[in-house]
Every structure is written in structure tokens, then in C-alpha cells.
């Protein structure tokens, strides 16, 4: 998932983001990336709220190279889940698994596009369940993260966490890091919440 957006930092501080030759204000746009999971053959995709929040344009690129315009169907900032839609038929989907049945030490795979490296898969184990980190900036947040040591980096947000049967057990959402990149602590929203 790629989005185009106005720079919220500059907007917050009232810093001009760009002007046309005639002096008319033109917001500066930037591109960002994330991942998503197709959950229906007609194009519904689950991703993270922060991947699509404030986006002015969404494009979805599939692993086979096809590109689609997408629209936001809905977001839930309390769970950090978003649903978007592309127009397509017979799209490949991922079946839901039972995140409640995951056991500590069980192998899982994180799938996504970290640093715009499409269709990247990393492996790790379930390190903990039901983590409440206070990471979702909403007083009504619902947090119960799956912790894993599968590598998750910027661009993985919204991507799939699957069990060894290839079933969706979580949506990769965040990392705990002092550098902003993977340091061994990755967190996913359980499929039971999605």
C-alpha cells in the first residue's frame, strides 16, 4: 500500500509546505509505504490505521505487479485496524487462523514490504501474547499484541503474521526499538481482534 499525504509535522507548526509560482499555497505531498492482507476475492484488504490515516491517495501493488487504486472503507484508531477496498475479482486471499490458539514458542512468519522490498518473509517465534504496550495513542485503545522475534521493519505495518499452516494469525503493527528499525521486538494485532 502506498499513500500520498500532506506532511503533518510541517502542517502542525504552520510551516508553509509549498507555493506555486503565483504565490498560491500548495500543500507538499510525500509518499509512504505499508503492507496489507487481501481477505476477500472482491478486494477487501486489512491493514493498519496508521498506514492509511490522512492519506489523500492510496495505491495497492500486488506481488504479481498489478496496481490498483484503493479507497478507505473504514478505520478503527482504538484497535489500529483499517479496511480498504480495491476493485478486482478472484483475488488471492489469506484464510484466517485462530490467534487465541497460538502457543509460546510456536513458529510464525511475518510477510510484508519492509523498506519497499516487496513480498519479504521473515521467520520467528511467538515470544508473548496479550501485550499491552500503551502504543496506540487513544484513551479507549484495545491492545493485546502478539510479540514475536520475526523481523518487522518500516513498511511491514499492515502485513500478515501467519502460522506454519499459512493462516492469518495477526497484522504486523509495530516494533520496540531505539533506532526505528528491528531490534528483536515486533508486535502484531491478533486475528481475533481483526
What are these regions (language model features)?
Residues 1-194:
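Serine-dependent protease modules
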Amino acid at each position: 500500500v502506498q499513500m500520498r499525504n500532506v506532511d503533518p509535522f510541517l502542517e502542525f507548526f504552520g510551516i508553509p509546505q509549498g507555493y506555486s509560482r503565483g504565490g498560491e499555497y500548495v500543500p507538499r505531498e510525500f509518499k509512504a509505504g505499508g503492507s496489507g492482507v487481501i481477505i476477500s476475492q472482491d478486494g477487501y484488504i486489512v491493514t493498519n490505521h496508521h498506514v492509511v490515516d490522512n492519506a489523500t491517495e492510496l495505491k495497492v501493488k500486488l506481488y504479481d505487479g498489478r496496481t490498483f487504486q484503493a479507497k478507505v472503507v473504514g478505520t478503527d484508531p482504538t484497535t489500529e485496524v483499517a479496511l480498504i477496498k480495491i476493485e478486482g475479482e478472484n483475488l488471492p486471499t489469506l484464510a484466517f487462523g485462530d490467534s487465541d490458539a497460538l502457543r509460546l514458542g510456536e513458529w510464525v512468519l511475518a510477510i510484508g514490504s519492509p523498506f519497499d522490498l516487496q513480498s519479504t518473509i521473515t521467520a520467528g517465534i511467538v515470544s508473548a501474547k496479550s501485550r499491552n504496550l500503551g502504543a496506540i495513542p487513544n484513551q479507549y485503545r484495545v491492545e493485546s499484541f502478539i510479540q514475536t522475534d520475526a523481523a518487522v521493519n518500516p513498511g511491514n505495518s499492515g502485513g500478515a503474521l501467519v502460522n506454519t499452516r499459512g493462516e492469518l494469525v495477526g497484522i504486523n503493527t509495530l516494533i520496540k526499538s531505539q533506532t526505528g528499525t528491528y531490534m528483536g521486538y515486533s508486535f502484531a494485532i491478533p486475528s481475533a481482534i481483526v
